[in-house]
């Protein structure tokens, strides 16, 4: 009696192997969770309110009525809000899984693009308002005061470098310019935003009215 090849474990035909082969598992992006999105939006709005309140409560009526006081206040306000929004903007594209579960990667990218123009515009306004405010207080010209701020105030020069980096990132983000650049170059320059935020940090703590004399606020920020 001849032995059956199947009984002795002979190799199965390709067709038999294909019938039992299971597809390889695929990685799926985290699905958006609307409930988490609403909570995150509430937290972000609360943070914005706290930042605004810190700036407003740091000013007194006498400071506002002094020469250049209004410009200085507007400079502080735009600086604080602009920095907060810049941090939010970076967080949106940080690829942190917990963050991506809130709105999904595509939704976060759309939010990032919607938020992006605001921090750069506000921080540019911050520099202009403060220069005008300090110039009015010193009864000096704006250009002269700009030079004084850059050379005689601590950490302002590196903050100006940070603002320049942010403006460069804003320029290359314009669609007409972005499409003409190699994606690798565009992405590498975008990573400089982390450097810009780090460079801008010292002058906020040393000179910001919301931080000077407020150690708890410094630690939280």
Explain the meaning of each model-derived region.
Residues 2-221:
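Membrane-embedded alpha-helical bundles that constitute the cytochrome b-like, heme-associated redox core
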């Amino acid at each position: 009696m001849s032995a059956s090849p199947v009984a002795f474990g002979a190799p199965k035909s390709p067709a038999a192997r294909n019938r039992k082969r299971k597809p390889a598992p695929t990685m799926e992006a985290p699905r958006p969770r609307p409930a988490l999105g609403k909570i995150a939006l509430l937290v972000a709005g609360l943070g914005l309110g706290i930042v605004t309140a810190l700036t407003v409560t740091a000013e007194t009526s006498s400071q506002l009525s002094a020469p250049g006081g209004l410009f200085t206040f507007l400079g502080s306000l735009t600086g604080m809000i602009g920095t907060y929004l810049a941090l939010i903007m970076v967080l949106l594209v940080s690829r942190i899984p917990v963050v991506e579960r809130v709105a999904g990667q595509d939704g976060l990218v759309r939010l990032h693009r919607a938020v992006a123009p605001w921090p750069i515009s506000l921080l540019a306004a911050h520099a202009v308002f403060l220069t005008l405010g300090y110039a009015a207080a010193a009864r000096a010209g704006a250009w002269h005061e700009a030079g004084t701020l850059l050379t005689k105030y601590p950490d302002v020069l590196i903050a100006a470098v940070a603002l320049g980096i942010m403006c460069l990132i804003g320029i290359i983000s314009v669609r007409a310019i972005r499409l003409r650049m190699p994606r690798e170059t565009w992405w590498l320059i975008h990573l400089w935003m982390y450097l810009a935020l780090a460079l801008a940090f010292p002058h906020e703590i040393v000179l910001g009215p919301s931080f000077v004399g407020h150690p708890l606020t410094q630690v939280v920020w």
